[in-house]
Amino acid sequence: MRVKGTNTTRIRRKKWLKQASGSFGTRKASFKAAKQTVIQASKYAYRDRRQKKREFRSLWILRLNAALRAQGMTYSVFINELKKAKIVINRKVLSELAIKEPNKLNLIINTIKKPTNKPTVAKT
């Protein structure tokens, strides 16, 4: 006699259907569609956990650049001067300073700003 794995099969299918419970229509009712939906959602979640890090770093840089341009400095020059001055502050903290405590960011800008004493060469 053939053995039907009813309990095991039902439990396995219910697990997939429970994971797809927030979906719409057939995607939450049909086992096959639910399984495909959950697998694709897992792929997107995996990808987006990595993208999230990139997007936040871009946001911090964007905010910082906007605050720095108001002070007459660009982001790239600012980061270069920070590295030369051996000041180690990450972009997240700098972004928060730019938004919540601009006076402290101005203090950092003033410490790294140097008067430009470049010799001018006269063309003859």
UniProtKB/Swiss-Prot annotation:
Coiled coil: none annotated. The gene is rplT. It comes from Mycoplasma genitalium (strain ATCC 33530 / DSM 19775 / NCTC 10195 / G37) (Mycoplasmoides genitalium). This is Large ribosomal subunit protein bL20. HAMAP family: Ribosomal_bL20. GO terms for molecular function: rRNA binding; structural constituent of ribosome. Gene3D superfamilies: 6.10.160.10, Ribosomal protein L20. SUPFAM superfamilies: Ribosomal protein L20. PANTHER family: 39S RIBOSOMAL PROTEIN L20. Keywords: Ribonucleoprotein, Ribosomal protein, RNA-binding, rRNA-binding. Pfam families: Ribosomal_L20.
